[in-house]
């Protein structure tokens, strides 16, 4: 997680939580047409009205604090079924599910894989790929997204 993303998460988490939601994660994409994506979650799901309420409050905080120079688009949404993963603690609730990983350095010769989440062991993600158990240091995870199964 970049320093800016960490700062935005720290700034926005209390706002989102005060509205009764969980801040699932924050993505900031720089450049022309910059985008700040705020993912919110709730045990009862997320509605369009929920996103609008959070967007309104987050916009106010961003206007006052001004943590991002220049113009950007704010997007507030549910993380969805194929949710991006932002923190190692989020994996615990999805043990047994598949996750698509993009790694900074190869593990067992692979930088990209879809594997089943077996466990979280401190700062290590334990996954199973083709019958082999792999220990992936979380510091090596560049991107991760749940891969829902449809039976």
From Swiss-Prot:
Which is a GO BP term held by this UniProt record? ribosomal small subunit assembly
Keywords, A to Z, come to: Cytoplasm, Ribosome biogenesis
Which spans of this chain does the record mark as coiled coil? none
Name the NCBIfam families for this protein: PRK00092.1-1
What the protein does comes down to: Required for maturation of 30S ribosomal subunits.
UniProt family annotation: Belongs to the RimP family.
Indicate what this protein is called per its UniProt record. Answer: Ribosome maturation factor RimP
Species classification:
Bacteria, Pseudomonadati, Pseudomonadota, Gammaproteobacteria, Oceanospirillales
């Amino acid at each position: 997680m970049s320093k800016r993303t960490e700062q935005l998460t720290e700034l926005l988490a209390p706002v989102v939580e005060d509205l009764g939601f969980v801040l699932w994660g924050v993505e900031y994409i720089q450049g022309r047409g910059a985008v700040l994506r705020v993912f919110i979650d709730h045990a009862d799901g997320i509605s369009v009205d929920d996103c609008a309420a959070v967007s309104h409050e987050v916009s106010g905080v961003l206007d006052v604090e001004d943590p991002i120079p220049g113009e950007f688009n704010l997007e507030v949404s549910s993380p969805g079924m194929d949710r991006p993963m932002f923190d190692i603690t989020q994996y615990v609730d999805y043990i047994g599910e598949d996750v698509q990983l993009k790694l900074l350095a190869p593990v067992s010769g692979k930088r990209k894989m879809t594997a089943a989440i077996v466990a979280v062991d401190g700062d290590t993600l334990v996954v199973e790929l083709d019958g082999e158990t792999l220990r992936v240091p979380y510091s090596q995870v560049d991107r991760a997204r749940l891969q829902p199964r449809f039976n």
